[in-house]
């Protein structure tokens, strides 16, 4: 995207299995993908794109740490309400067809670590540092220090009660 955001998919509602109901909208920028995306761009020599992605990430993470989302729209949109489009049949009849993603409102502790890892990788890879990155990281670390023991929805994006996930604590 011209904003520097990297979208996970160009499609919505492709089923995890034909006829199933796990048909999500992935047309968003996921913070969990940030480190791997930045690393791939740097390895491939796309330093300008890597810098644009890092800058996009800094804009997304610049708010209050407790409001950090797991995903954003390509231009940093925060409101991603999930709607079902019941009049559409879906791929191979797999319903529902969705737009938006309710997981955007989930608390997933590991994304804080993913953001930290991405910003560390950006510096280690030689991207021009951004002075405000340290302020953002300090705020994220303070939040993590106070909240690391909270249950969350985890990498699995569980729809239901929050739980304790090892992955969330380690990342």
List where the protein language model places each region.
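Acidic, mature catalytic/reactive cores of soluble proteins
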Residues: 1-171
């Amino acid at each position: 995207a011209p904003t520097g955001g990297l979208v996970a998919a160009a499609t919505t509602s492709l089923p995890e299995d034909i006829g199933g109901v796990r048909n999500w909208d992935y047309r968003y920028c996921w913070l969990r993908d940030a480190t791997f995306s930045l690393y791939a761009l740097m390895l491939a020599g796309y330093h300008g794109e890597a810098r644009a992605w890092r800058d996009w990430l800094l804009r997304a993470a610049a708010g209050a740490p407790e409001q950090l989302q797991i995903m954003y729209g390509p231009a940093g949109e925060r409101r991603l309400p999930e709607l079902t489009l019941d009049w559409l049949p879906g791929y191979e009849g797999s319903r529902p067809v969705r737009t938006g993603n309710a997981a955007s409102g989930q608390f997933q502790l590991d994304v804080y670590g993913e953001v930290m890892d991405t910003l560390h990788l950006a510096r280690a890879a030689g991207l021009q540092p951004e002075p405000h990155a340290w302020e953002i990281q300090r705020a994220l670390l303070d939040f993590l220090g106070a909240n690391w023991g909270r249950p969350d929805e985890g990498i699995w994006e569980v729809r239901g009660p929050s739980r304790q996930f090892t992955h969330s604590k380690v990342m």
